[in-house]
Amino acid sequence: MIRLICGLQRPTSGSYRLYGSENTDKKILEAQRRIGAVVETPSIYLDMTAEENMKEQYYVLGLPSFEGIPQTLKLVGLEDAGKKKAKDFSLGMRQRLGIAIALAGKPDLLVLDEPTNGLDPQGIVEMRELILKLNRERQITVLISSHILDELSRLATHYGFIDKGTIVKEITAEELENTCRKCVKLQVTDTAVLAHILDKRGLEYEILSDTQANVYGELVVSDVALELAEQNCRM
């Protein structure tokens, strides 16, 4: 999916839309120019410095001036890399250089494929902070492909789930959190009585019908059952 929207691969079937343009429309190329991406491994020249790598990308994009390079390198935390060659960078530094290169064209959308893969704990924290910074300070939308759900939960506002090349579900972070909450479904003879008991205990719940309710959080079922029985309500 990522390779398709970045124009690195053609679809064998199906379609996609970017900024209102179908993939079969000639305007799709204009839409793809609004995207910066780091797909799989960063595309960098190992025998060049961070600044030299950036200049190469500026040449490729036909940008008239190198003025933005120092600012971009500072943004990703590579302003002090100096004359150090990329081959001597840590994995985290290479990832950040890849992002700097992807930012050269001032994209609206940044696509990152497994950006924390292989990084040590400190590198993961730095990558997370950088992604949040790009979103908050430059208003760049970031599309992340990752299997590390715990890390995604610290970043994502929306999730998309893909199965065999098809997006099967899209959901907000809040909706996902609610879906994944611990929940006990209770069936009773009177949910009005159950609601009164749960309110006293300060528990969150959802009444599904006259006889069924979902209860969220830590629940001692035996205690609730005893209290229900005292009020002639069976569970």
Summary of predicted features, one role per range:
Residues 110-114:
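Catalytic Walker B motif of ABC-type/P-loop ATPase nucleotide-binding domains
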Residues 6:
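Helix-to-loop junction immediately C-terminal to a conserved catalytic motif
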Residues 128-214:
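ABC transporter nucleotide-binding domain
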Residues 14-24, 30-31:
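Conserved ABC transporter NBD signature motif
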Residues 106:
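Conserved catalytic motifs of ABC-family nucleotide-binding domains
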Residues 55, 64-81:
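Conserved ABC ATPase "signature" region
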